[in-house]
Swiss-Prot record:
This is Succinate dehydrogenase assembly factor 2, mitochondrial. Belongs to the SDHAF2 family. The keyword Chaperone applies. Gene3D superfamilies: Flavinator of succinate dehydrogenase. It is found in: Mitochondrion matrix. It comes from Caenorhabditis elegans. Its main location: mitochondrion. Signal peptide: none annotated. GO terms for cellular component: mitochondrial matrix; mitochondrion. InterPro entries: SDH, SDH_sf, SDHAF2.
Length: 119
């Protein structure tokens, strides 16, 4: 009984995760932009909600399909939420695959430009 419940839980949670966190095959570009905007604003930690949400609002409409795919991989890929925040806020150095990503560089520049200078 317990193993059936656990199996059902993992099946449902895996299905839901694939719908909300991964690229959807055959997804139209407008639907992808809408999904990424939502996912950028609802990250799970307020810091990323603000940083990524603001970036997405201002930039997703201008991004090409390959850029959207790279952004999707950046925010929904293997990196933990706090790690993304630490990379963007200069608290941790990003790994080479993140640092070399042009979309990450755009997000990083956006975040750096928003930073309030210390007096």
């Amino acid at each position: 009984m317990t193993s059936r419940i656990l199996q059902r839980f993992f099946t449902v949670s895996t299905s839901l995760r694939s719908l909300t966190r991964a690229e959807v095959p055959g997804e139209k570009i407008d639907a992808k932009r809408a999904r990424l905007l939502y996912q950028s604003k609802k990250r799970g930690i307020l810091e990323n909600d603000i940083l990524l949400g603001d970036f997405a609002e201002q930039n997703l409409k201008k991004m090409s399909e390959p850029e959207l795919k790279a952004y999707d991989k950046l925010i929904n890929g293997e990196h933990m939420e706090w790690d993304l925040f630490y990379y963007l806020s200069n608290k941790k150095s990003p790994p080479e695959d993140v640092e070399s990503c042009q979309v990450y560089q755009k997000v990083k520049k956006f975040v750096d430009d928003k930073r309030v200078p210390k007096s």
